[in-house]
Structures are given as C-alpha cells and as structure tokens.
Amino acid sequence: MAHILAVDDDPDLCTLLKTALERDGHAVEIRTSGVTVTESLCRWADCILLDVMMPGEDGFATCRRIRAITQAPILFLTARTDEQSVLTGLGIGADDYLTKPFRVAELRARVAAHRSEERR
C-alpha cells in the first residue's frame, strides 16, 4: 500500500483517482489546489499526482516546492500536451508526465512502476 497525494482542481477527476487507487489498496489524499499542499503532506506521500493548470499556484510551482521537500515520485496528469510543458515538467523534477485524457489502467501501471523503482 502506498500513500498517494493527488492534486487537481477537477472534482470529478479527484473522485475517479481516489476510487481507482483506493481499489488498489492505496491511501489517497486529495487536494484541489497546489497552495494547499503542506510540507507534512509531502512527507506523508509515497507518490504524488499533480495537475499543471490549477488556480493560485500552477503545478510547475507546486512541483518545485514538493521536490525541495521529498524525493517521492511525482507524476503530472495534465491536459497540457505541448512539448515545452512536457520538457518543463520533467526538467523541474517530475518523474513522469501523462496527458489527459488518460486510461486508468495506464495510470495504475505507472504508479506501480514508480513505487517499485523507489523500493529498489
């Protein structure tokens, strides 16, 4: 079981993420804005799912803050498909970048892969 932090401003997607990942036995904490991600929450998380386009603080700024606190895998889940966004996300420390819409099975597989890499 992993502790997964999901940060996205879309409540329907948050519900989908929580349901799918809890079904796999993970504990899932949801935040709808990057500014609500605290240091203690970052330290709790074994894996972080992060949107890019959010009000208040975008996902890139949130990723930079998180990366200064923890080395837990960060996976972007975003509608931003342009090459510059992908390169920016990976360049600032994200471990993976999935574009919306995504398949839940693929998300589950990527979370599992990053979790097993971290345990090595």
Question: Whereabouts are the PLM-identified features?
Answer:
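Conserved phosphotransfer cores of two-component systems
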Residues: 41-44, 65-72, 92
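C-terminal output helix
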Residues: 84, 98, 102-115
